[in-house]
Amino acid sequence: MKIALVGATGMVGHVMLEVLAERKLPITELLLVASKRSIGKEISFEGKILKVIGLETAVAAKPNIALFSAGGDISLEWAPKFAAVGTTIIDNSSAWRMDPSKKLIVPEINGNELTSEDKIIANPNCSTIQMVMALAPLHKVYKIKRIIISTYQSITGTGVKAVEQLNNEAQGKKGVMAYPYPIHKNAIPHCDVFLENDYTKEEMKLVHETHKILGDDTMGITATAIRIPVVGGHSEAVNIEFGNPFEISDIRKLLHNTPGVVVQDNPETNTYPMPIYAEGKDDVFIGRIRRDTSHPNAVNLWIVADNLRKGAATNTVQIAEYLIANVL
């Protein structure tokens, strides 16, 4: 299987290389693709030194699958060019997510929707992926009516410049500013750009992508997204109102039996998910599971995951695995 990684020199691209090596995909040839300024750069993969190539060269090589993590503009321009030579694209940007002709995939939830006709497949936003991993099994049984979300998001979701800003500020140095304010010892309620409705783009991604993945746009969803000075992963406080009655013990059991989910929930031993322990792992961790005392048919969850792995690289590679095993 010939696979191209577009955006191989970026933060997510680096993690994707790690995940590809860990999960042992049947790769006969790996093409590392990046912008012109990175062409010729050498990157190690499984003991071999590979040279970065340009987009034109990669298209000419006609890979079976192209994993895109190079931003929306690159995806909009180049994904159709790869598709035209028979390549199946899995795109990690927001470029194709809400296109009604493209599927938005979390393999554990809706991977079975994929067919050989799907040449451009969208990977959801990081904060959406970890949340729907919890919501999907609950929605099937209890029918979700409304969701209230507050996210506490890692600076790695912004990129290398944000990590550099935090490190500089922690050391008292001046330097690049990825955010309009200091991030060290701060919380910024501003993820992505503000929209006309005064929500941020990140907040509305949670709304629209959740509707699409779960196949139900009747549920009410509102979100507040906050950037905090951590690097291990995203955390979410999620309040879920159901249409059907439930028992907390059944909620715990259902989540415990969900593939890709790890329940960490024992107040007596101070056991609950935290990004410092989620970092580097592919599971979605759920804890603080409790009935909403203000509403008889609602539950509160605390959901944590590594945004660069399950929130990006791992989910992308899992889609590729599904395609290789069932479609291509």
Give the predicted meaning of each segment:
Residues 1-183, 218-220, 284-285, 289-295, ...:
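N-terminal Rossmann-like NAD(P) cofactor-binding subdomain of oxidoreductases
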Residues 66, 155-328:
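Charged docking surfaces used in two-component/phosphorelay signaling
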